[in-house]
Amino acid sequence: MAKGEGNVLAQHKKARHDYHIVETIEAGIVLTGTEIKSVRAARIQLKDGFAQIKNGEAWLVNVHIAPFEQGNIWNADPERTRKLLLKKREIQHLADELKGTGMTLVPLKVYLKDGFAKVLIGLAKGKHDYDKRESIKRREQDRDIRRVMKSVNRR
């Protein structure tokens, strides 16, 4: 867990498998009252989500926040686009990185920090199938090496 990161409410576990994460940035999320209650109850899914830059603002798209059960008429659309709170120079940096490079912004995790909901956004480049196979092969080799070293150290 990164420094200052509170309790993690949701993670996009497959993101590091599907993408090369180049850089991460912490951003706040603009939420309604019933949405923050659902987020605190960990009823959020990042699987299909992504972020985009439009008109100098950062937006979180396709992140599903389940309707709050006691929210009735105050519940917002679960799939609505939510504004991300970033500094202007951070948004400009991300916009420059995204221009024509095959990069995308992927939400990696949502957590609470000092009572506020934060999202860790990753600047990512998609992996090819052979990259994924290579990552799996490397992980299995590391696991085998650790297993052998553990058995050698026990003797």
Swiss-Prot record:
One of its GO terms (biological process) is trans-translation. The lineage of its organism: Bacteria, Bacillati, Bacillota, Bacilli, Lactobacillales. SUPFAM superfamilies: Small protein B (SmpB). It comes from the Bacteria. One of its GO terms (cellular component) is cytosol. This is SsrA-binding protein. HAMAP family: SmpB. It is found in: Cytoplasm. Transmembrane segments: none annotated. The keyword Kinase does not apply. Keywords: Cytoplasm, RNA-binding. Its main location: cytoplasm. It comes from Streptococcus equi subsp. zooepidemicus (strain MGCS10565). Required for rescue of stalled ribosomes mediated by trans-translation. Binds to transfer-messenger RNA (tmRNA), required for stable association of tmRNA with ribosomes. tmRNA and SmpB together mimic tRNA shape, replacing the anticodon stem-loop with SmpB. tmRNA is encoded by the ssrA gene; the 2 termini fold to resemble tRNA(Ala) and it encodes a 'tag peptide', a short internal open reading frame. During trans-translation Ala-aminoacylated tmRNA acts like a tRNA, entering the A-site of stalled ribosomes, displacing the stalled mRNA. One of its GO terms (molecular function) is RNA binding. The keyword Cytoplasm applies. It holds the Pfam family SmpB. Belongs to the SmpB family.
